[in-house]
Amino acid sequence: MNRVILSLKNIDKTYGKEQVLHNASFDIEQGEICGLIGENGAGKTTLMRILLGLIQSDKGEIKSVSQHKIGSIIESPALYPNLTGRQHLQYYKTRFSLKTDIIKMLELVRLPQTSWDRKVKNYSLGMKQRLSIAIALLDNPELIILDEPVNGLDPQGISDLRKMILNLRDQLGVTFLISSHILSELEFITDKYIIMKKGKILNVMSSKELANDLSEKLFLKTSANQILKTFLKEEGIVHFEQDDYLVVPEKEKLMLLLEYSVASNLVIQDIYIKKERFEDYYLSNII
């Protein structure tokens, strides 16, 4: 097991009469890319603000690397529109007396060299995200916290961001905690999922555990679905309809359904097995 660099135990937070975090607990190990998953209003941003020391929890314990070893982008990137990308890094390097090579940072986040001396007001959102992450890297953090980083990005921007995060983890050993409600965009890079609902941590699971938890469903389309549907009901087999298909969550029922279809002279027009997507799992089990 890798070194635990962040540990939360029993974190509570209340605003007025509304409790927005309830007994939140989880650990993050060095080098992990962790997805903090939940609907808007689940408490993700509040939790991240507590981790960064921007607000205080009402109770609970946090053990982590020192604050200067945590970089972050919370909500939209805070940049100065009339400064260039290079000037941003030079400003923060001077302000905090850092010795980091700013050219190396710009190259690490793959910000195009032609944009280094261009004013940020002329940057795309994806370029602004890259620059913000370069700023977060200036103090050589062990952990970077990103709040909804894919918001507003086009598909190419999302793909580029994923590649950059993987590259930074692999090259520098940086650990990431990334919040999102766009689940499919984290599915390709996440090592661990922390699933939240209404301020509570519902589950903490590795990507391997989640993959094992995703079911494989049988999709079947015949010349007379209604007859087959009646048979499924009589046999007590769980099923539902999707478009023109009957969907059976138990793929093991395949032979039984084939035998019945042949015996009943039903023409099988299409049949396949499909693994449940994370998005579907989330919608059916969490929301």
Where are these regions (language model features)?
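The feature captures the beta-strand-to-loop junction immediately N-terminal to the Walker
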Residues: 37-39
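Catalytic Walker B motif of ABC-type/P-loop ATPase nucleotide-binding domains
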Residues: 144-148
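Helix-to-loop junction immediately C-terminal to a conserved catalytic motif
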Residues: 52
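ABC transporter nucleotide-binding domain
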Residues: 166-246
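Short, charged/small-residue-rich alpha-helical element at the C-terminal edge
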Residues: 216-285
